[in-house]
């Protein structure tokens, strides 16, 4: 009864698994995990405890055992677009333009690595957040990188951040480790790094695969605003993202 990866979300995949279990266990198949279903699940768990092949939620400590990126499916999600400008710098630079430039270059580098790459937008288009998740899910993506910029009331605020899925005590171990890896690459490339954080954002929750939202720059910081307009900066950031994957 394959319910997919542990994400702390009762979605269609989990509901189908619940229905299959109920039908095979001789229960009323309604997809509702009530008292009778929980009792039967607990009985099965006790019966299976200690047997070979017991489910482990996170193999290899959260790492994906691969020598290269070749063959992986990656979705790049440049945040905002169209009438949704996102953050706007003091000089009028829109977040939507920065994320698109970074996303397009990251996609080029990933294709050169042999990845199958899809972008949620390749032009100045406004794409709803759930449509972004559906695009990634439809492509059966292995990795989803959502690109944004940060902002703060203080122009001194600076440093990259990454967000992985977390709700209550459920979190994505793969996402957390990817955030750490990308952060290390950004620091090695000379960019300040604040850290990684678990969040229950819609895209992180709804998209399958290993999902991460990255905000490498503060557009409200004058130095970052200047960097965001330099092609060599976009190149370094894109290479840090690809290296982190």
Where are these regions (language model features)?
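Catalytic-site microenvironment of enzymes
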Residues: 1-245
């Amino acid at each position: 009864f394959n319910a997919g990866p542990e994400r702390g979300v009762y979605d269609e995949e989990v509901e189908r698994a619940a229905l299959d279990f109920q039908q095979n266990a001789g229960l009323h198949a309604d997809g509702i995990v009530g008292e009778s279903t929980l009792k039967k699940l607990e009985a099965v768990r006790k019966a299976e405890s200690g047997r070979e092949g017991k489910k482990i939620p996170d193999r290899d400590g959260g790492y994906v055992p691969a020598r290269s990126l070749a063959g992986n499916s990656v979705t790049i999600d440049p945040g905002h677009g169209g009438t949704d400008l996102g953050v706007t710098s003091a000089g009028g630079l829109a977040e939507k333009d920065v994320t698109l430039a970074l996303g397009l270059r990251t996609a080029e580098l990933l294709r050169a690595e042999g990845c199958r790459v899809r972008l949620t937008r390749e032009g100045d288009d406004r794409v709803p957040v759930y449509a972004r998740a559906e695009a990634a899910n439809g492509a059966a993506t292995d990795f989803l990188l959502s690109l944004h910029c940060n902002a703060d009331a203080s122009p001194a605020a600076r440093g990259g951040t990454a967000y992985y899925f977390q709700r209550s005590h459920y979190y994505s171990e793969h996402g957390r480790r990817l955030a750490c890896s990308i952060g290390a690459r950004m620091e090695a490339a000379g960019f300040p790094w604040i850290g990684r954080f678990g969040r229950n954002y819609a895209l992180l929750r709804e998209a399958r695969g290993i999902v991460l939202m990255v905000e490498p720059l503060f557009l409200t910081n004058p130095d970052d605003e200047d960097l965001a307009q330099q092609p060599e900066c976009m190149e370094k950031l894109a290479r840090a993202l690809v290296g982190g994957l």
